[in-house]
Amino acid sequence: MMDTKVLCGANSYEQKYYFNQEFSSLPQSIKDELHIMCVLYTEDVGGILTLEFDDSGALEFKVTAPEEDYLFDEIGSVLKIKQYQEEKREMLESLELYYRTFFLGEDLDGEE
């Protein structure tokens, strides 16, 4: 069963940003960073970007764009996501830890 929970997302077609209020307890600086990251991605590349947690707590970048959108930069998309994963590694790992602790109820003290 692959249930995902959307953290946030941005849509270049409607020029909108979405933040899941279930995560409202995150620090404002993290929420701001996510907002900037998603909006800049869609401004640079186009399409729709969502950051989603999978059922194991891994944070994934999901990108969608209609096939008829010839302005969507598929190569730029891969490069931009790779850039974010490197530059924002610490923040992304912290978000995964937060999700696994508060949403999945994992006891992280017992990790080996």
Label for each model-derived stretch:
Residues 1-44:
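Negatively charged, low-complexity tracts enriched in Asp/Glu with abundant Ser/Thr
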Residues 26-30, 81, 92, 108:
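Short, structured coil/loop segments at alpha-helix boundaries
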Residues 1-4, 105-112:
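Short acidic DE-rich linear segments
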Residues 43-99:
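Amphipathic protein-protein interaction modules
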Residues 97-100, 104-107:
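Charged/polar positions within long, soluble alpha-helices
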